Design a protein with these regions (language model features):
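Class I SAM-dependent transferase core
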Residues: 1-31, 47, 61-75
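Active-site phosphate/pyrophosphate- and oxyanion-stabilizing loops and adjacent acidic/basic residues
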Residues: 18, 42, 109
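Conserved beta-strand/loop positions that form the S-adenosyl-L-methionine
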Residues: 33-35
Length: 167
């Protein structure tokens, strides 16, 4: 998130991040791939203290920032920061999230191995959600998985957030 995004911090980034909270089962384990500034993982951890959240970030500078943020916010009991790449990570989770990481075909390759049986991938997407879901239709059929685009909103006045849900 750069300086030009300050005016849209709440609507585009924070509310956008928590909009998917109702799609996540109670007490789920959640992996935020390419966590960057901690979105959506940190806002979800604050809103949903029942979740066990892992923030996965390959860049040292960002991973250090995330560790400081988790400590400052007092989230050490529910949030873990891991420096690493999705394709090298081996643990599985009930929910894997991706926001502004990659196009859906690439994101699936990195994230599907990290989704536990009966788990789900929640990818925050913009208006490209339907198109990207069509691009991966064959992959999902081959894996006996389904995908849908869900429009969710954290607040009645907020812009809708488009989530591609893969299960």
């Amino acid at each position: 998130i750069g300086p030009r995004e300050v005016d849209r911090l709440w609507s585009r980034h924070l509310l956008n991040s928590v909009a998917m909270a109702n799609l996540i089962a109670p007490s789920a384990t959640l992996l935020d791939v390419g966590s960057g500034a901690g979105l959506p993982g940190i806002p979800l951890a604050i809103l949903r203290p029942d979740l066990k959240v892992t923030l996965l970030e390959p860049l040292l500078r960002r991973a250090n920032f995330l560790t400081e943020a988790v400590d400052e916010l007092g989230l050490q009991d529910t949030v873990t920061v891991v420096r690493g790449r999705a394709e090298e990570h081996r643990q599985t989770y009930h929910v894997v999230t991706g926001r502004a990481v990659a196009a859906l075909p690439k994101l699936l390759g990195w994230c599907l191995p990290l989704v536990a049986p009966k788990g789900q991938l929640l990818a925050l997407k913009g208006e490209s959600a339907e198109r990207e879901l069509l691009e991966v239709h064959g992959i999902l059929i081959g894996r006996r998985m389904t995908g849908e685009v869900v429009s969710v909103s954290a607040h009645p006045l907020a812009e809708p957030t488009w989530v591609v849900r893969i299960r």
